[in-house]
Amino acid sequence: MATVNHASTRGQRRGTIRTRPHERILASYPNCHVRVLFLPTQRALESRGGTCTVSSQRLVFTSNQASEELDTLSVPLETMSVGKYMLPIFCAPYWQATMTHFTDGTSDHGQVIVRFPSGGGMSFQQTIRTAQAQWDIERHHEDILRTYQGSNVSSVR
């Protein structure tokens, strides 16, 4: 589930995240602007400066300023669409994706938009696509190789 302004990430040194078991940090992108749009209510949260970190399990944003309305965002890769990278003519490039299942209970889907005023957007797009593809492969292997639970069935003679 996607989490916004979660207590477990507040109070940490800005730009750092606590990794989960078996989670690897793939890349960090400073000076990002992030906007989260909750659908269908059209409620939006925004931060104009922070670090986006792509890990093997999720996308994490931490704001540079604690006073921002969007302090932290954590989105598991499996709840996010592939996304698209846009290069508008008159503003900073951005990446946009649809995400599902927020923990706050107010919405079951929304959009995340990450702007890159200082560059790095193409690298971000490649990193997150690679992470999502790897997550899909690992998940597929887990589904195929389920653990054997044994049964209480006796043999028939």
Could you say what each language-model-derived stretch is?
Residues V36-L37, S63, M99-F102:
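Short regulatory "switch" loops immediately downstream of catalytic or recognition motifs
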Residues M1-T16, E69, V75-R157:
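Acidic, Ser/Thr- and proline-rich intrinsically disordered linker/docking segments
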